Amino acid sequence: MKKVWIGIGIAVIVALFVGINIYRSAAPTSGSAGKEVQTGSVEENEISSTVMVPGTLKFSNEQYVFYEADKGTLEDIKVKEGDKVKKGTALVTYTNEQLSLEKEQNQLTSESNRLQIDQIQEKLKALDSKERELEKQVGKKEAEKQIESERTELQMQKKTAEIELKQTELQRQSLANRVSDLEVKSEIEGTVISVNQEAASKKSDIQEPVIHIGNPKDLVVSGKLSEYDTLKVKKGQKVTLTSDVIQGKTWKGTVSAVGLVPDQQESAAAQGTEQAVQYPLQVKIKGNLPEGKPGFKFIMNIETDKRKANTLPSKAVKKEDDQYYVYTVKDGKAKRVDVKIGEVTDDLTEIKEGLTQDDQVILNPSDQVTDGMEVKS
């Protein structure tokens, strides 16, 4: 019996020991009021609204020269790939036998018109002499009367010949313009990017440019804006450019152009469909140009708005379903407070409603923090 009571006593002691350890492990450690957290309040910071748009590196200004069959036969390509050209540099020349014949015919017609006018002028002079002889015989008035109809006829012929000469001169000017067009010149200053001999000899089924000119030192990034974003993006806004290909680098730029009307090709493709229209966007790069070539893809982060706002570090704001919230510290306990947010950047989140400047917000809430939990700041 005595052994039984000793066993019961040992069991009770063990149970008490285990219970005390469980209590100690569940209770806060000595000298601590709960989980230690870092707190702070909302602060006024400058925050920017941004629009992210994919874009492509392109020449700011470029020229494509296509084969034009109506000009005649392509005689000569005067540049090669890599050549530097200035505005007005001859690129290609055409020959046109029909145009040469028309030009020669025009010259002959002009000579004929001039000869006709000279002949009529000689007849008028002869008529004046005839009139003076008649005056001696029948008097001045009678002489004028007899000569009048013949003079009127000659003057009419002369006027008609002069009109025909003017028409011939106009044709000559038109032909001169067409002859001038047989030499295609550069419209920009830049570098010959490519020369396509097959396009020049018409061997390609798809029309391709014979010559492509661009300026590698004058590049832009172009993209497309949605209807919604085009209301926010304006000319002159700052842009930060990044590339997945050229990692670890950023470039600065400004919006240089926003289309007033949708992209024509996009609009044509979207006719009769539910596709949203898109507006062309162009960004001018500042400073050093990217090492990439035209065609490289970039991401444009456009700063559309910059203002002062009440903010918290983004990691302090949590989300459950569609509701954003933070934890504040009140009377040593964490308290969940629902908030309404505005703009969000990588580091800051705008707080529009739900907090005051006096509220102490947990800046580093872990997943273990819960509403009503004892914390120490």
UniProtKB/Swiss-Prot annotation:
Main location: membrane
Subcellular location as annotated: Cell membrane
GO molecular function: identical protein binding; transmembrane transporter activity
Domain of life: Bacteria
Membrane topology designation: Single-pass membrane protein
Coiled coil: 95-187
Annotated transmembrane regions: 3-23
Keyword Cell membrane: yes
Up-regulation conditions: Expressed in exponential-phase cells.
InterPro entries registered for this protein in UniProt: CusB_D23, RND_pump_MFP, UPF0194_transport
Family: Belongs to the membrane fusion protein (MFP) (TC 8.A.1) family.
PANTHER family membership: EFFLUX SYSTEM COMPONENT YKNX-RELATED
Classification via NCBIfam families: RND_mfp (TIGR01730)
Quaternary structure, from the entry: Part of a complex composed of YknX, YknY and YknZ. The complex interacts with YknW.
Protein name, as recorded: Putative efflux system component YknX
Organism lineage string: Bacteria, Bacillati, Bacillota, Bacilli, Bacillales
